[in-house]
Amino acid sequence: MLHTRSAPPTSFLLRKMNAGRTYNVLFLCTGNSARSILAESLLNTLGKGRFHAFSAGSFPKGQVHPLAIDLLKRTNLPSEGFRSKSWDEFAAPGAPPIDFVITVCDNAAGEVCPVWPGRPMTSHWGIADPAAVEGTDAEKAIAFRKALMELETRVKLFTSLPIGSLDSMTLQARLRQIGRTATNTESA
């Protein structure tokens, strides 16, 4: 009788990701003008080199919302080099391999997404669209600040995950849990 030795069971992430590796994360929203831009800047800062964030949209607006750039500047987060772009750039040959795709708006979460090379882990972190707020300049600024605070809470939870030591089912559950995290932004 021939005995074969099989490898111990590991998740695709444990096989694919090892210690010291930078994880590529793609944040998606419809217009790629506010929420996904804020998330990209936050993760590239708070991820401290462990993560490289990108952002894109299903129907990019063509420009980043000026209040998003203003808020990034006022909070000392990176604000240069952002552009509103299509998610197709990240599904094309030669695109950076993406490990996580996170939608930050309900519209993008409900759309049929491209097939992402490498089958990244996905999650939805719904955040109200600050660009849709009508009212005074102060009310609009508050909406952007609230979105940034909610994203910051979730990004901090994400960066604290021991990704390399979690199996894929546990990691997926943790990502969903982060997406359901309520934040107290009433004082925004």
Please annotate each region the language model reported.
Residues 2-188:
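Short polar/charged helix/loop
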